[in-house]
Amino acid sequence: MSRLSIHPEGSTNATSPAEPLLESDDPAVIKVELAKRGIAFQRWPAKVKLDQNSSESDILAAYAVEIARVQADGRYPTVDAIRITPDHPDREALRQKFLDEHTHAEDEVRFFVEGCGLFCLHIGAEVLQVLCEQNDCINVPAGTRHWFDMGSKPQFCAVRFFDNPEGWIANFTGDAIAERFAKLP
């Protein structure tokens, strides 16, 4: 189930965050709270059951209608699919790469068609932890400080939309704030 926790960024303890200001697993509450902070959150039906051996092109073909809908306005000409499983040979390196706080020059749009991942958004004096699961689509605007955790045994597949042909390019902030917040097991 999708979940939102909102924490103040500060804490009297250097190794853990302050108690959450809000916690909810209600998609309507999640959508409203994120929208107040400029983050789009929608629930889309992940209608297609993918085979574990589905290729990237199979995944993109299965969600061609949804992809076309997002790409219709021309903002996101580049799309790919990422699938990380517990036996993925690069899972640890990929997890580490996403765990440090960073920004992007473009929006980060993800539609989860399987599994889950934890987006942590550092907005103003708050950190919003958004557990995205199957059927969730999140749009993190360009310049938003954030990090992403897929867990030590990741299991997710997401369609990713980009407004540049290079795809995922991070600008790391150097802030160690992510170390104070819970990660997925």
From Swiss-Prot:
| Positions bearing the site annotation: May play a role in metal incorporation in vivo | 101
The answer, when asked if Thylakoid is one of the entry's keywords, is no
Protein family (similarity comment): Belongs to the acireductone dioxygenase (ARD) family.
Q: What is this protein called?
A: Acireductone dioxygenase
Q: Which UniProt keywords apply?
A: Amino-acid biosynthesis, Dioxygenase, Iron, Metal-binding, Methionine biosynthesis, Nickel, Oxidoreductase
Its pathway is:
Amino-acid biosynthesis; L-methionine biosynthesis via salvage pathway; L-methionine from S-methyl-5-thio-alpha-D-ribose 1-phosphate: step 5/6
Signal peptide per UniProt = none
Cofactor(s) recorded for this entry are: Fe(2+); Ni(2+)
Q: What does this protein do?
A: Catalyzes 2 different reactions between oxygen and the acireductone 1,2-dihydroxy-3-keto-5-methylthiopentene (DHK-MTPene) depending upon the metal bound in the active site. Fe-containing acireductone dioxygenase (Fe-ARD) produces formate and 2-keto-4-methylthiobutyrate (KMTB), the alpha-ketoacid precursor of methionine in the methionine recycle pathway. Ni-containing acireductone dioxygenase (Ni-ARD) produces methylthiopropionate, carbon monoxide and formate, and does not lie on the methionine recycle pathway.
User: Cofactor: bound how, per the entry note?
Assistant: Binds 1 Fe(2+) cation per monomer. Binds 1 nickel ion per monomer.
- Show which residues form the site (Important to generate the dianion): 110
Single GO molecular function: iron ion binding
Give the catalysed reaction(s), semicolon-separated.
Answer: 1,2-dihydroxy-5-(methylsulfanyl)pent-1-en-3-one + O2 = 3-(methylsulfanyl)propanoate + CO + formate + 2 H(+); 1,2-dihydroxy-5-(methylsulfanyl)pent-1-en-3-one + O2 = 4-methylsulfanyl-2-oxobutanoate + formate + 2 H(+)
Chain sites annotated for binding Ni(2+):
102, 104, 108, 146
| Membrane spanning stretches | none
Q: Which residues bind Fe(2+)?
A: 102, 104, 108, 146
- Top-rank taxon: Bacteria
* HAMAP family, A to Z: Salvage_MtnD
Give positions of region: Disordered. Answer: 1-22
Coiled-coil stretches, from where to where? none
Q: What is the lineage of its organism?
A: Bacteria, Bacillati, Cyanobacteriota, Cyanophyceae, Synechococcales
Q: Where in the chain is the site May play a role in transmitting local conformational changes? A: 107
Subunit composition and interactions: Monomer.
Name of the gene this protein is made from: mtnD
Could you tell me the Gene Ontology terms of the biological process aspect for this record?
L-methionine salvage from methylthioadenosine; L-methionine salvage from S-adenosylmethionine
Could you say which EC number(s) this protein's record lists? 1.13.11.54, 1.13.11.53
Write down the InterPro entries for this protein, in alphabetical order.
Answer: ARD, ARD_bac, RmlC-like_jellyroll, RmlC_Cupin_sf
Q: Which top-level enzyme class is recorded in the Swiss-Prot or TrEMBL entry?
A: oxidoreductase
